[in-house]
Amino acid sequence: MSPLLGLRSELQDTCTSLGLMLSVVLLMGLARVVARQQLHRPVAHAFVLEFLATFQLCCCTHELQLLSEQHPAHPTWTLTLVYFFSLVHGLTLVGTSSNPCGVMMQMMLGGMSPETGAVRLLAQLVSALCSRYCTSALWSLGLTQYHVSERSFACKNPIRVDLLKAVITEAVCSFLFHSALLHFQEVRTKLRIHLLAALITFLVYAGGSLTGAVFNPALALSLHFMCFDEAFPQFFIVYWLAPSLGILLMILMFSFFLPWLHNNHTINKKE
């Protein structure tokens, strides 16, 4: 009976965690509806929507990370949840990036003004910190056996490789994800969301054991805030500079190098 009771308790805890994540999604969705109706100033509108989107992403990822730690022997279950919630975020967070790298990409490609970009970046960073403390307050309620507020304030270093490999991992993940984001724009919405969710799941599978495969500076700040405090240079390089480097390389390749290569090839064919 004891193993059965343990299994039942574990199942209840998992369902509670899933319920919390879906509740966050619903609450943020309701808040977005209210914000769209009540906020008419573009700056305030952009700030609030980006804040809510980043809050949703960070809170759900905190809970997903906790679930993955409780089920290390079942990585398929964790990856299934990553895919499912990537779909949920893709469907509900339309028009926001929840990622400073996405804002940087839009600004560098001329799709967003510097002023709007700065507002969105500020919203993401503030939301990342708020989500951390809200998650800690929620965990302190002890809704499940592994919801302990102290967990969110402990530094668990997710970097399991040397600095160079960690930088390459985060840069490559950022490069691949934002390349797909850029080139899937003409794909039908329903298919695009599934493709991006599958890509995110693959990147988490491939890079999760190395750095956590975050490729999002705001999310990294929320997940590993205490680690930033204890080992700032390392975490700044891996989780902020490396994804930004991936964005820069992506833009250089698709906006400059490949067009230049194509033009040279065309000229050579004419000659």
From Swiss-Prot:
Residues 36-41, 96-163, 216-234 are lumenal. It catalyses: H2O(in) = H2O(out); glycerol(in) = glycerol(out); H2O2(out) = H2O2(in). GO terms for cellular component: cell surface; cytoplasm; cytoplasmic vesicle membrane; endoplasmic reticulum; endoplasmic reticulum membrane; intracellular membrane-bounded organelle; plasma membrane. It is a multi-pass membrane protein. One of its GO terms (molecular function) is channel activity. The keyword Hydrolase does not apply. Residues 1-14, 63-74, 185-194, 256-271 are cytoplasmic. It is found in: Endoplasmic reticulum membrane; Cytoplasmic vesicle membrane; Cell membrane. Keywords: Cell membrane, Cytoplasmic vesicle, Disulfide bond, Endoplasmic reticulum, Membrane, Repeat, Transmembrane, Transmembrane helix, Transport. A motif (NPC) lies at residues 99-101. The keyword Ion transport does not apply. Detected in the sperm head and tail (at protein level). Expressed in subcutaneous adipocytes. Expressed in testis, kidney and ejaculated spermatozoa. The chain crosses the membrane at residues 15-35, 42-62, 75-95, 164-184, 195-215, 235-255. Not glycosylated. Its main location: endoplasmic reticulum. SUPFAM superfamilies: Aquaporin-like (SSF81338). GO terms for biological process: endosomal lumen acidification; glycerol transmembrane transport; hydrogen peroxide transmembrane transport; intracellular oxygen homeostasis; intracellular water homeostasis; negative regulation of epithelial cell proliferation; negative regulation of ERAD pathway; negative regulation of response to endoplasmic reticulum stress. A motif (NPA) lies at residues 216-218. Belongs to the MIP/aquaporin (TC 1.A.8) family. AQP11/AQP12 subfamily. Channel protein that facilitates the transport of water, glycerol and hydrogen peroxide across membrane of cell or organelles guaranteeing intracellular homeostasis in several organes like liver, kidney and brain. In situation of stress, participates in endoplasmic reticulum (ER) homeostasis by regulating redox homeostasis through the transport of hydrogen peroxide across the endoplasmic reticulum membrane thereby regulating the oxidative stress through the NADPH oxidase 2 pathway. Homodimer; disulfide-linked. Homotetramer. Can also form homomultimer. The NPC motif is essential for oligomerization and water permeability function. This is Aquaporin-11. It comes from Homo sapiens (Human). The gene is AQP11.
